[in-house]
Amino acid sequence: MAAPGRRWSVLLFRALQSLSARRALHDTAPPRDVLLFEHERGRFFAVLGLFCAGQGVFWASLAIASLARPPTPVRPTDAKTPDHGGLDLRSTLWRYGLAVGCGAIGSLVLGAGLLFSLRSVRSVMLRAGGKQVTLTTHAPFGWGAHFTVPLNQVSCMAHRGEVPAMLPLKVKGRRFYFLLDKAGHFPNTKLFDNTVGAYRSL
């Protein structure tokens, strides 16, 4: 008599396991698109784009001005012209060094602003079926740019509770991390943690 009861217990346990597995699969494979993250900062990135553009123009104008040769004073033809070869060489080196420095600073400001805007995530959308995810970044001037990748090519490098401000996402085939500001809105935290927020070895 104990054998049939044990058999029914095993069958019931397997049925419950199958039901829980199907429910978990359904949770991570929604029938329609689901918004997982959203953080609107269009005004901030518009101001950041204008600031970086202004800095680029400013440092470029300084570099051009430093390359301009200063006017040489007019001397009488009968006066003896002293030899200023060493002084001219130092002046030329200083002007070219200043131009290179100004160009480097301007390029650094522009590059940092461009990279930050292209890697700051505005929204994360899990596509129907749970196989693909669409990331939308703020892009320069807050214009926005989006791309869709398979979910198995996205890896979250830290849990939401482990980082104070920014959540880093690694996308296979793309350099640098994508940043999710924790000040944003997570409409479905459980689904986010099980899909985009999960760590994967890429």
UniProtKB/Swiss-Prot annotation:
Keywords: Membrane, Mitochondrion, Mitochondrion inner membrane, Transmembrane, Transmembrane helix. Residues 1-43, 119-202 are mitochondrial matrix. The chain crosses the membrane at residues 44-64, 98-118. One of its GO terms (biological process) is mitochondrial cytochrome c oxidase assembly. It comes from the Eukaryota. Pfam families: TMEM70. It is found in: Mitochondrion inner membrane. Signal peptide: none annotated. GO terms for cellular component: mitochondrial inner membrane; mitochondrion. The keyword Mitochondrion applies. Its main location: mitochondrion. Residues 65-97 are mitochondrial intermembrane. GO terms for molecular function: mitochondrial ribosome binding. It is a multi-pass membrane protein. Belongs to the TMEM223 family. Mitochondrial ribosome-associated protein involved in the first steps of cytochrome c oxidase complex (complex IV) biogenesis. Stimulates the translation of MT-CO1 mRNA and is a constituent of early MT-CO1 assembly intermediates. Associates with the mitochondrial ribosome. This is Transmembrane protein 223. It comes from Bos taurus (Bovine).
